[in-house]
């Protein structure tokens, strides 16, 4: 049985004063993630009415591809940035699978 690709919808809301830096940190994830095995889609979006809100639409071929993604140096740098700077007012992640 073939594994159905996994879609992740990840929302971030920057804490006041962290909007630009958080946006830059999120943008830095895009290019290297596109090169990862199993990455199908990795798109960063922003709310045009609220510059503190960002959303990733991600599609990976498998859970193994997601596991690899979160172990990469660029993702680990982002996690370190989050821990060191506390730039988030809110964050959520929803995981989806296609209906066959």
Feature roles, as predicted:
Residues 16, 50-51, 61-64:
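Short, charged/polar surface micro-motifs in flexible loops or helix N-caps
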Residues 10, 22, 42, 54-56, ...:
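Hydrophobic packing within well-folded, soluble alpha/beta domains
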Residues 1-5, 44-50, 80-100:
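Glycine-rich beta-strand-turn "strand-cap" elements at beta-sheet edges
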Residues 6-12:
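Active-site-flanking beta-strand signature of metal-NTP-handling nucleotidyl enzymes
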Residues 13-19:
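Short, surface-exposed ligand-recognition loops at beta-strand->loop->(often short) alpha-helix junctions
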Residues 31-55:
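Short, glycine- and small/hydrophobic-rich beta-strand elements in well-ordered beta-sheets
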């Amino acid at each position: 049985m073939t594994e159905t690709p996994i879609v992740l919808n990840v929302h971030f809301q920057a804490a006041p004063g962290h909007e630009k830096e958080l946006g830059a940190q999120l943008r830095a994830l895009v290019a290297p993630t596109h090169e990862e095995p199993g990455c199908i889609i990795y798109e960063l979006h922003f709310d045009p009415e609220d510059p503190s809100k960002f959303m990733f639409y991600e599609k990976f071929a498998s859970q193994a591809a997601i596991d690899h993604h979160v172990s990469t140096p660029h993702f680990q740098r982002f996690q370190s940035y989050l821990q060191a700077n506390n730039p988030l007012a809110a964050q959520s992640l929803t995981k989806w699978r296609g209906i066959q």
